[in-house]
């Protein structure tokens, strides 16, 4: 609705002025679309801004915060306390513990030395106890028992007769059994410490008797005697408690002595010291000593 104001003017041109004003007012409402466009431009610019909010999507960062949680869970700080608990300081005390064991082994070697030296001083005083008449008589019985023939007809050499003692069917004669009992009884009456030198004197007496006798059967002893003395008796000067033996006779003493030492304790059930040897106090020398 348009209102017109009428003024009293003589000319009617004034009526046209309001008509000019209306078209001037008409473009004015056309300007507001610019105003509408102006706000529309910033608003769509501001709208993508909230659309660009991937930043709330960054709450994944707390998921990434689990990595620092894994850092304390890492075993590396656990290994760090393990390193101060290294076994190297534990091995260091083990080494000083092993070192006292070496001085412990040294006294063992020191104890073993007197043990090996003990039988030698024991044999020397025991060899001095041999000259008693009763012991010589007892040893002569054992010597006769070892040299006696234990078969019916044939006379067995020394080595064969000693080995035959292990065979029960060979010893059949009563005389052999009687002398065996006498020898075992008399050997049991001797002190245990003096049994070893007693057996040594038996061995020496047997070997010396084989050297003197010429009516010995064929065997190892007779062949050795023929090579040494050509069938002639060998006389050696003998001191009380000590007998001189030729170097060539050591093999003979070793064979006879080992057999006697093995057979007599088994036959008589008598204990003999383990350090007993067939040589004992017998010294090596030449025929003129």
UniProtKB/Swiss-Prot annotation:
Coiled coil feature spans: none
Low complexity biased stretches: 18-40, 60-131
InterPro entries noted in UniProt: Bifun_inhib/LTP/seed_sf (IPR036312), Bifunc_inhib/LTP/seed_store (IPR016140), Glia_glutenin (IPR001954)
Matching Gene3D superfamilies: Plant lipid-transfer and hydrophobic proteins
Q: Principal localization?
A: cytoplasm
Question: Which is one GO molecular function term here?
Answer: nutrient reservoir activity
Where does the protein end up? Cytoplasm; Vacuole
This entry carries the following GO cellular component terms, namely:
vacuole
Its keywords, alphabetically, are:
Cytoplasm, Seed storage protein, Storage protein, Vacuole
Pfam families xref list: Gliadin
Residue ranges, compositional bias (Polar residues): 1-10
* Pro residues: bias regions: 41-59
Q: In which tissues is it expressed?
A: Developing endosperm.
Record carries keyword Ribonucleoprotein: no
**What are the start and end residues of every segment in region (Disordered)?**
1-132
The free-text function statement in the UniProt record for this protein reads: Has a role in the transport and targeting of prolamins to the vacuole of developing barley endosperm.
Q: Which family, according to the similarity comment?
A: Belongs to the gliadin/glutenin family.
Free-text note regarding domains: Sulfur-rich hordein which possesses an N-terminal half composed of proline-glutamine blocks organized in repeating units and a C-terminal half where the repeats are dispersed and less conserved.
This protein is called Gamma-hordein-3
Species annotation: Hordeum vulgare
